[in-house]
Swiss-Prot record:
Keywords: Cell cycle, Cell division, DNA damage, DNA repair, Hydrolase, Isopeptide bond, Metal-binding, Mitosis, Nucleus, Phosphoprotein, Ubl conjugation, Zinc, Zinc-finger. Beta-lactamase activity is inhibited by sulbactam. Zn(2+) binds at residues 122, 125, 140, 144. The gene is DCLRE1A. The keyword DNA-binding does not apply. There is a cross-link at residues 202, 236, 269, 353, 361, 429, 488, 508, 517, 533, 536, 668, 670, 674 (Glycyl lysine isopeptide (Lys-Gly) (interchain with G-Cter in SUMO2)). Residues 53-65 have a biased composition (Basic and acidic residues). The modification Phosphoserine is found at residue 590. Belongs to the DNA repair metallo-beta-lactamase (DRMBL) family. InterPro entries: DRMBL, Rad18_UBZ4, RibonucZ/Hydroxyglut_hydro. It is found in: Nucleus. It comes from Homo sapiens (Human). Residues 396-614 are annotated as: Nuclear focus formation. Residues 15-76, 582-602, 623-651 are annotated as: Disordered. This is DNA cross-link repair 1A protein.
Length: 1040
């Protein structure tokens, strides 16, 4: 229970590990079997949840039933004629393991002194996970994918390799072994009522071996050209070529069935595990045996690791869904009968006929691929874009000599944004076959958290493809105004002898989309989006019926997202590409998902296979020409979001491309990114953001940084170009206030003289935009009288007093330390209507002493230490600027200069304060007081610094001045006790540059403002309401 609570607190989701109770009469029969298989004499983790994970992994391997087929697929060897309902009951019984019986096995199989032994094999190198030492399977696969292959030599043992030495799998490749393991898969044959349709299957293809494929290209091409069928996998009990090539399982459905193919892309090769189609023009009609597919076990990577397990009562995960659009010309139409399967014909190019003459029927098939570890991973397609051949033939980006047909691969991000749809072909001629996309009532669709294939709404694809192909492939497409019209391909450009049946398929790129929801693109925007150059052949004659996925959501452990992260791929760039280099699709978490907050790319350069390829997007629509140099453009990513979620709020940003309709808004955002914002990547800051505006997540400047009635903002540089802002004020030079300022900033900045020097010398802001104002002097800025007052915070820190034309007086304190001396400043007789208050320590627990008292304590302590030990070194911790009063006072008493780094020395020189310049030096060996960064004031850092002094000092007395040290711990400075370790003592002195609670209270009650607006710790309603309560109490006490 504690574990569940901890996970919920950390990851913000409820653990799903606790299994659901089921009827003992239904589930108990298979429980012992599940537990026995989970353990099987091997060590499982001593926690019950780990045993349940292992049981689930075994369950999924033993019962390879896709989620979509769970209630409808039957085993040929056992119950081919069994009903759909029986299949559902059997699946649920096998996959449900009550927690009670699982716990009873704990004492029998737990051996905490034995290292865990994992089942399965690495989907990339094929090393058995049982050989892992000190690694989990997930860890190993992650490293295996990231590390480049060391060898291209195939293992001499081939299929018989049983090595358990990890280095062996680095020394040799194991392509044949991977292929063999992928092929050992249970299948069921088609039902006589299938009408020649193929149904869902679970691919055994485990890994995308891009690097290893090259050594097998010639062999594959030769075997394909000689054999009538394409064989890419081995089957133990499937002697005929027809059986071996089809890797298809029958999906027994109530009314309709779907055709599915399993393909695999390796090194720019698209290999169909469908039928090899002859090059002649004859129809191929091969009978599909009903009971010949073998019922073999499948060997691949474990589906659940020790850190990633779902409820046992949930069905095993279906893998990636594919939608095939099968285009057949008039001559190459699909034929079907009760006993045979329709096959595609092999052509080298599509015969483009007139629309009226031949309207090819596109038969849509919803398919799924089981644990397709590397299938269609776009990082393996490094050169997808190819120009159109000069002989006017439509060329694909792959060498399709070894395929069973010409396949057109939609980019996954493009397909992923389209609505989930099931397409049906229309009957135009009675002699042409028609396949209906089948999806029975009991069949479940799952939108995976990981990469899964897209079901595409064809009208959207149509609108996306028409205009781009008119411009890129002139004469290839003719746009039609309605959804029902069929696009025709020009017959002038292609050879009539090379007509083809082509299949277009798309990947589902939505991980974890909430059930029943689909992320779609605006049709109008898509119609003007240039399509990738490698989409050359379009399906024709399509209608669609949109359907929503069901509520079952499970994890997909495919190799690209084995760790909950989309796989990396190299980004393709075109010459002259704009600032937009990639658009990351961050999916919306589903309520049933685990790791909703873990599946995020850290590196912005890590583009997933769910992204658009930047080289396929038109520069004029996706970027705005900016004034700064190209190198700066390439360093930033401006992420666009145009995803519309049906009935759900987005918890994480969905970044999609929105083109012409929002170009103006994008221009506004990106101009500031270049000219004003500099190198700051605003997307990484956790700052309040507005809703989806202009296709980009634009940060919103909070109201407490705006001065009402003016065009002024205070310390608001990190929010981009603030609408209506005519002058930007900076209170002091601390990074949390000047964040966003850089040398590219081109708006007027008003600050103190010291802060202006720091901006010019440290941030290199152009001097023409820096407007220093004197202290205690009335100045006119854009018609508003402004006065800067000392804030007693750090050098150059100021409070800003605004006198609005309507008589309203506003005081913005910035960061300040209230002091009684302020009561004798220009505020003495001033009525303040609104007070923007620094509320850093607005809580009664912060009752630290005054600065003068702390400085006296530090002086006395340092003087005593140096007097007792002349070789003692005094060290003070500092930030970039601040805490100067402490070390300057100590150095003055000890009669020594303050030694510091060159960088710190330059910073203090910018202050132009004579008293400071006379007491600082970079010669550390000649001074008794040293300055170090605050983060180095610890025993390890100080010990290291002591060694650098070459033995001149044998003791360190360090001061860490910070107000946090004193929070709710001490009431007097005398109570401060040092931390001592050896010859190093560290004093955490309560020297703060922010007001304590009592100082703040005194200042407010003296100033008597009509309204107080807190500027710090305002992130939650609770903290704001608490401070409001304090303000009311202060007002009542003061009687105003």
């Amino acid at each position: 229970m504690l574990e569940d609570i901890s996970e919920e607190d950390i990851w913000e989701y409820k653990s799903k590990r606790k299994p659901k109770r089921v009827d003992p009469n239904n589930g108990s029969k298979n429980i012992l079997k599940s537990v026995e298989k989970a353990t099987d004499g091997k060590y499982q983790s001593k926690r019950s949840r780990n045993r349940k994970r292992a049981a689930e992994a075994k369950e999924v391997k033993d019962h390879e039933v896709p989620l979509g087929n769970a209630g409808c697929q039957t085993s040929v060897a056992s119950s081919q004629n069994s009903s759909c309902g029986d299949g559902i009951q059997q699946t649920q019984d096998k996959e449900t393991t009550p927690g009670k019986l699982c716990r009873t096995q704990k004492s029998q199989h737990v051996s905490p002194k034995i290292r865990p032994v994992y089942d399965g094999y690495c989907p990339n190198c094929q090393m058995p996970f049982s050989s892992l030492i000190g690694q989990t399977p997930r860890w190993h696969v992650f490293e295996c994918l990231d590390s480049p292959p060391r060898s291209e030599t195939e293992c001499p043992d081939g299929l018989l390799c049983t090595s358990t030495i990890p280095f062996h799998y680095k020394r040799y490749t194991h392509f044949l072994l991977a292929q063999s393991r992928a092929g050992d898969h249970p299948f069921s044959s088609p039902s006589p009522a299938s009408g020649g349709s193929f149904s869902e299957t679970k691919s055994g293809v485990l890994c995308s071996l891009e690097e290893r494929w090259s050594s097998y290209q010639n062999q594959t091409d030769n075997s394909v050209s000689n054999d009538p069928l394409l064989m890419t996998q081995y089957f133990k009990k499937s002697p005929s070529l027809t059986e071996a090539s089809e890797k298809i399982s029958t999906h027994i459905q109530t009314s309709q069935q779907a055709l599915q193919f399993t393909d695999f892309v390796e090194n720019d090769k698209l290999v169909g595990v469908a039928l090899r189609l002859a090059n002649n023009s004859e129809h191929i009609n091969l009978p599909l045996p009903e009971n010949d597919f073998s019922d073999c076990e499948i060997s691949y990577s474990p589906l659940q690791s020790d850190e990633d397990t779902h409820d046992i009562d949930e069905k095993p995960d279906d893998s990636q869904e594919q939608l095939f659009f099968t285009e057949s010309s008039k001559d190459g139409s699909l034929e079907e009968d009760d006993d045979s399967c329709g096959f595609f014909k092999k052509r080298h190019g599509p015969l483009l006929k007139d629309q009226d003459e031949s309207c090819p029927k596109v038969n849509s098939f919803l398919t799924r691929d089981k644990y397709d570890e590397g299938l269609y991973r776009f990082n393996s397609l490094n050169d997808l874009s190819q120009p159109i051949s000069q002989n006017n033939e439509s060329t694909l980006p792959y060498d399709l000599a070894c395929t069973g047909g010409d396949f057109v691969l939609f980019p996954p991000a493009l397909a992923g944004k389209l609505a989930a749809s099931v397409h049906q072909a229309t009957k135009a001629k009675p002699d042409e076959p028609e396949f209906h996309s089948a999806q029975s009532n009991k069949q479940k669709q799952v939108i995976e958290e990981s990469s899964v294939y897209n079901q595409v709404s064809l009208p959207l694809v149509k609108s996306l493809m028409l205009k781009p192909f008119e411009s890129q492939v002139e004469g290839y497409l003719s746009s039609q105004p309605t959804q029902n019209t069929i696009r025709k391909l020009s017959s002038e450009n292609l050879n009539a002898k090379n007509n083809t049946n082509s299949a277009c398929f798309c990947r589902k790129a939505l991980e974890g989309v909430p059930v029943g929801k689909a992320t779609i693109l605006n049709t109008e925007n898509l119609s003007s989006t240039p399509a990738p150059k490698y989409l050359k052949i379009l399906p024709s004659g399509l209608k669609y019926n949109a359907r929503h996925p069901s509520t079952k959501v499970m994890k997909q452990m495919d190799i690209g997202v084995y760790f909950g992260l989309p796989p990396k791929r190299k980004e393709e760039k075109l010459l002259g590409e704009s600032a937009l280099e990639g658009i990351n699709l961050n999916p919306v978490p589903s309520p049933n998902q685990k790791r909703s907050s873990q599946c995020k790319r850290k590196a912005e350069k890590s583009l997933s296979d769910l992204e658009f390829d930047a080289s396929t997007l038109h520069e004029s629509q996706l970027s705005v020409e900016l004034s700064s140099e190209r190198s700066q453009r390439q360093k930033k990513r401006c992420r666009k979001s145009n995803s519309l979620q049906e009935g759900a709020c987005q918890k994480r940003s969905d970044h999609l491309i929105n083109t012409e309709s929002e170009a103006v808004n994008l221009s506004k955002v990106k101009v500031f990114t270049k000219s004003a914002h500099g190198g700051l990547q605003r997307g990484n800051k956790k700052i309040p953001e507005s809703s989806n505006v202009g296709g980009s997540r634009k940060k919103t400047c909070p109201f407490y940084k705006k001065i009402p009635g003016t065009g002024f903002t205070v310390d608001a540089f990190q929010y981009g170009v603030v609408e209506g802002c005519t002058a930007y004020f900076l209170t002091h030079f601390h990074s949390d206030h000047y964040a966003g300022l850089s040398k590219h900033f081109t708006f007027p900045v008003y600050c103190s003289e010291i802060t202006g020097n720091l901006l010019k010398n440290k941030l290199h802001v152009q001097e023409q935009y820096i407007h220093p104002l004197p202290l205690d002097t009335e100045c006119i800025v854009n018609g508003v009288k402004v006065v800067l007052l000392d804030a007693n915070h750090c050098p150059g820190a100021v409070m800003i007093l605004f006198y609005l034309p309507n008589g309203t007086v506003i005081l913005h304190t910035g960061d300040f330390r209230a002091d009684p001396s302020m009561e004798r400043s220009l505020l003495a007789d001033q009525k303040v209507h609104m007070l923007y208050l620094d509320t850093t320590y607005c809580s009664p627990e912060y009752t630290f002493p005054s600065q003068q008292e702390v400085i006296r304590f530090a002086i006395n302590t340092a003087f005593e230490a140096v007097t007792l030990n002349p070789h003692a070194l005094v060290v003070c911790g500092t930030y970039s600027i601040g805490k100067e009063k402490v070390f300057l006072a100590i150095a003055d008493v000890l009669g020594s200069k303050v030694g510091m780094s060159q960088e710190k020395y330059k910073t203090l020189q910018c202050l132009n304060i004579p008293e400071i310049n006379s007491l600082i030096t970079t010669d550390m060996c000649s001074s008794l007081v040293h300055l170090l960064p605050m983060m180095q004031i610890n025993f390890k850092g100080l010990q290291s610094h002591l060694k650098k002094c070459g033995g001149k000092y044998n003791q360190i007395l360090a001061f860490r001045p910070t107000g946090w040290t004193h929070s709710n711990k001490f009431t007097r400075i005398a109570d401060v006790i040092p931390q001592t370790k050896g010859n190093i003592s560290i004093y955490g002195i309560p020297y703060s540059e922010h007001s304590s609670y009592l100082e703040m209270k005194r200042f407010v009650q003296w100033l008597k403002p009509q309204k107080i607006i807190p500027t710090v710790n305002v992130g939650t309603w609770k903290s704001r309401s608490t401070m409001e309560k304090y303000f009311r109490e202060w007002k009542l006490e003061a009687g105003y």
